[in-house]
Amino acid sequence: MKYIGAHVSAAGGVENAVLRAVEIGGNAFALFTKNQRQWQAATLKAETIEKFKRFCQVHQFTADQILPHDSYLINLGHPELENRQKSVAAFIDEMQRVNQLGLKLLNFHPGSHLNKISERDCLAYIAESINIAIKTVPNVVAVIENTAGQGSNMGYRFEHLAEIIEQVEDKSRVGVCLDTCHLFSAGYDISSWQACEKTFTDFDQIVGYAFLRGMHLNGSKTALGSRVDRHHCLRDGTIGTAVFEYIMQHHQFDHIPLILETIQPEIWAEEIQFLRDLSAK
């Protein structure tokens, strides 16, 4: 079964994200468990946690169908120790929130070297940061998102993801989320069925489908290999729709959250139906 949804707003309380996912016909969703542009957040109240869990139960969402995302401020590969420690502390807090909500995945952007250290050192810091977090918080899987490679962001090559995973001590606590826009912008061609075969075979050989815990389904406004991260609607932009048909028709993408982060929330319900129609072709 395909779990399809979108990154919905948690404004007014995380429990509202469940209702917004239902409104657009999703059987999956992503959310921020706190303001993604602030370091600090109030702790989750017992009442909020209870409501979130109850709403999930009522609307039949399991932890496998929900992909929380961490704060954009966090940089687990920061070259400076003090800033890296601040990021690790914030990441641990995010993991604890996810665990409190009864969820088990935390999606994050790996980190940036800020042109101050080598890529290899940055990847080692990211892995070290993950190791600290998963030793501190039980149950939650750290889900590394591939990036477009904009600026000094790491994670734009499959080899980066594999190198991080290799250095994580408990492999059951680490996974990957592939973003289609980021793949294309980073230079992985997914614009045809044949191109998808090559790219996803490479992914399986270098990283492995066993680590795939979610996907972000996005169109792109920029060209193949642009290294610029600009999302578009599914049926617009430079990628085309072959990749979405490929994903919907291959079992390797079953039972993981397939999350829209496309730029027009008002057509998410339509885009979800479009994906479901592709799986029936």
Swiss-Prot record:
InterPro entries: AP_endonuc_2, AP_endonuc_F2_Zn_BS, Xyl_isomerase-like_sf, Xyl_isomerase-like_TIM-brl. Zn(2+) 1 binds at H69, H109, E145. GO terms for molecular function: deoxyribonuclease IV (phage-T4-induced) activity; DNA binding; DNA-(apurinic or apyrimidinic site) endonuclease activity; phosphoric diester hydrolase activity; zinc ion binding. The keyword Zinc applies. Coiled coil: none annotated. Keywords: DNA damage, DNA repair, Endonuclease, Hydrolase, Metal-binding, Nuclease, Zinc. Its cofactor is Zn(2+). Zn(2+) 3 binds at H182, D229, H231. CDD domains: AP2Ec. It holds the Pfam family AP_endonuc_2. Its EC number is 3.1.21.2. It is an enzyme of class 3 (hydrolase). Zn(2+) 2 binds at E145, D179, H216, E261. It catalyses: Endonucleolytic cleavage to 5'-phosphooligonucleotide end-products. Binds 3 Zn(2+) ions. The keyword Hydrolase applies. It comes from the Bacteria. Belongs to the AP endonuclease 2 family. This is Probable endonuclease 4. It comes from Haemophilus ducreyi (strain 35000HP / ATCC 700724). The gene is nfo.
